[in-house]
Amino acid sequence: MNRYRYESIFFRYISSTRMILIICLLLGIGDMSAMGLKKDNSPIIPTLHPKGNENLRATLNEYKIPSPLFDTLDNSYETKHVIYTDNCSFAVLNPFGDPKYTLLSLLLMGRRKYDALVAWFVLGRACGRPIYLREYANCSTNEPFGTCKLKSLGWWDRRYAMTSYIDRDELKLIIAAPSRELSGLYTRLIIINGEPISSDILLTVKETCSFSRRGIKDNKLCKPFSFFVNGTTRLLDMVGTGTPRAHEENVKQWLERIGGKHLPIVVETSMQQVSNLPRSFRDSYFKSPDDDKYDDVKMTSATTNNITTSVDGYTGLTNRPEDFEKAPYITKRPIISVEEASSQSPKISTEKKSRTQIIISLVVLCVMFCFIVIGSGIWILRKHRKTVMYDRRRPSRRAYSRL
């Protein structure tokens, strides 16, 4: 009897352990989803439209990308230079060039409505990488910028979208715990009724956090400026999100979950601003000794001498699906920018980290499977032994005959 007693206690222990593991696994997955995180602790990019918002139209954006060189001499702002030192918080990119003056001039001319576009790029050596793009239509000049009846999806570079979002003013780019590889020249392009407002900001990341996301920089995604003649978001595999505030909350919760400095209000004062650079700094930044390697008959020169300040074929807010088929240009030889010698190590470490996570997950699943198999086997054996014991102890029926 003692043997069966101990076996029963052991079986109950195995069953309770198995149930605890299953419950913990379910709670862990549910907690990640509730916090807006994936299994690798990276933020989830919300792509669903907010319910009941009839003003959001995905058809407004025709996926056309303007050129980062869209500029005029009338709004040649200085290049702001900021240094990021708060290693586990947010980097705020807010260059010069406020659209409120353009809206004021439209209001003085008696115009009550306007259309607009906001785009962010990171510039390389004679190339540009689109980060963010959003269009607005039927906006009011009496309201702050971005107060519109129609808004397109916010189109994001997938890698930047994991740790970045656009501020509530629709203008500032916020990056959570940036790594050193994100240092560089960024440009923001605002187009209001065809009038461009282009401004640059130079970001220098001096200190990074241990969990800063690496592997965001990719030279293949930095396209030569001739790409933007017919370039679309489809050629770049950009992701569209219709819930910017949910996107913002997911990035903030991700930073707080992994130990970053979560601030209720993200302000620009966290950045150290040094002396501004002239607007001509962009031209010197573009030039590279390797530019001539990519000049051929079929490809427009990547140097700034052969690039005009037109819109590169961009005609503003249109809704012509037939234009989607007019973008056959795909970069065959990407412009290789000058990068640090240590830039390859973050990619390798990221790959090793992901492999380690996969191996750990497989080991945990195998252990859980073994627990389930062992517990099920013991349960079957116990049931079988109970049946045998019951059959042995059951009294046999004897036939009694009358005397």
From Swiss-Prot:
Positions on the Intravirion side per record topology: 379-403
GO cellular component, one term: virion membrane
Family annotation (Pfam families): Herpes_glycop_D
Glycan attachment positions: N87, N138, N230, N306
GO biological process terms on file: entry receptor-mediated virion attachment to host cell; symbiont entry into host cell
Keywords noted in UniProt: Disulfide bond, Glycoprotein, Host-virus interaction, Membrane, Signal, Transmembrane, Transmembrane helix, Viral attachment to host cell, Viral attachment to host entry receptor, Viral envelope protein, Virion, Virus entry into host cell
Localisation per UniProt entry: Virion membrane
Chain ranges on the Virion surface side, renumbered to this chain: 35-357
Keyword Signal in record: yes
Region forming the signal peptide: 1-34
Membrane topology reported for the UniProt record: Single-pass type I membrane protein
Chain segments annotated as transmembrane: 358-378
Bridged cysteine pairs (disulfide): C88-C209, C127-C222, C139-C148
Similarity-based family: Belongs to the herpesviridae glycoprotein D family.
Function (record text): Envelope glycoprotein that binds to host cell entry receptors, promoting the virus entry into host cells. May trigger fusion with host membrane, by recruiting the fusion machinery composed of gB and gH/gL.
Protein name in the entry: Envelope glycoprotein D
Lineage: Viruses, Duplodnaviria, Heunggongvirae, Peploviricota, Herviviricetes
Gene from which this protein is expressed: MDV094
